[in-house]
């Protein structure tokens, strides 16, 4: 079961938290549960449109009666904010037009993008779109995650790999990735690479160690005050120009799925 289910949804309330936090019991049009779900999908689609280079990791949405708070986690906050905050103002105005409510937009920087599964998947997909060999791209993403402190990494690519006539799936794994262990802190990301041969799906699992319920509650309690009142400002600084050093590829576990 742990091999098939989404690792994030499988661990809700144990090591992960909901990315949409609101309650709806109204029967009025525009305030029903289905209306909020559709609106959340539209918000996330709007956040990904035109910000492909920003390295967006995840979008968290929280609603009150007359306000919507959107937390945008990104590896490059400067691209999202824009010159003198022009891009952030544009995003906020589009969100207010979409929701019809006051929107609080918080732009938060991902401190360690090499350990973020979604960003690693995006990086591999960008390399595949640039015609880099898929095995080389997979190994490079795994090496960067291992150097950043990951205890285990698994990367899987599915599609017409290398331009082959028949599609297949291949994966590489280093370290431990215990998908059945609920207390295991496993980050999961998926992204599609658009190549000349068609789309190639990239899945990434990163194991960061075990987490107890007490540690999870402490992490949630410390994250709430940091996000409050920091609209349109990145959290922390990071040298975007520094490139990771190249290292020799270690021995890895490989596999092929028909």
UniProtKB/Swiss-Prot annotation:
Organism domain of life: Bacteria
GO cellular component: cytosolic small ribosomal subunit
GO biological process: translation
A Pfam family: Ribosomal_S3_C
Domain KH type-2 per the UniProt entry, residue ranges: 43-111
Xref: InterPro entries: KH_dom, KH_dom-like_a/b, KH_dom_type_2, KH_sf_prok-type, Ribosomal_S3_C_sf, Ribosomal_uS3_bac-typ, Ribosomal_uS3_C, Ribosomal_uS3_CS
A GO term for molecular function: structural constituent of ribosome
Keywords associated with the record: Ribonucleoprotein, Ribosomal protein, RNA-binding, rRNA-binding
Stretch list, region Disordered: 217-258
Function description: Binds the lower part of the 30S subunit head. Binds mRNA in the 70S ribosome, positioning it for translation.
Protein family: Belongs to the universal ribosomal protein uS3 family.
Protein name per UniProt: Small ribosomal subunit protein uS3
Annotated source species: Beutenbergia cavernae (strain ATCC BAA-8 / DSM 12333 / CCUG 43141 / JCM 11478 / NBRC 16432 / NCIMB 13614 / HKI 0122)
Gene: rpsC
């Amino acid at each position: 079961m742990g091999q098939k289910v989404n690792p994030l949804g499988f661990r809700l309330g144990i090591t992960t938290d909901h990315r949409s936090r609101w309650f709806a019991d109204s029967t009025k049009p525009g305030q029903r549960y289905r209306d909020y779900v559709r609106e959340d999908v539209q918000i996330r689609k709007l956040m990904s449109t035109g910000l492909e280079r920003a390295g967006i990791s995840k979008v968290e949405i929280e609603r009150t009666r007359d306000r919507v708070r959107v937390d945008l986690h990104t590896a490059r906050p400067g691209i999202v904010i824009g010159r003198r905050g022009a891009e952030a103002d544009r995003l906020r105005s589009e969100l207010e037009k979409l929701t019809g409510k006051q929107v609080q937009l918080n732009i938060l920087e991902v401190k360690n993008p090499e350990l973020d599964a979604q960003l690693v998947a995006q990086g591999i997909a960008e390399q595949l779109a640039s015609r880099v060999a898929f095995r080389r791209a997979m190994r490079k993403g795994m090496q960067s995650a291992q150097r950043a402190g990951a205890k285990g990494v698994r990367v899987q690519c599915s599609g017409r790999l290398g331009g082959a006539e028949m599609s297949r799936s291949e994966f590489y794994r280093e370290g431990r990735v215990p998908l059945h262990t609920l207390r295991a802190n496993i980050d999961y990301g998926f992204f599609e690479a658009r190549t000349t041969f068609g789309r190639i799906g990239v899945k990434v699992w990163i194991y960061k160690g075990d987490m107890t319920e007490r540690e999870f509650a402490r992490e949630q309690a410390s994250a709430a005050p940091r996000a409050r009142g920091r609209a349109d400002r990145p959290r922390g600084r990071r040298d975007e120009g520094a490139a990771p050093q190249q290292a020799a590829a270690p021995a890895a576990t490989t596999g092929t799925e028909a």
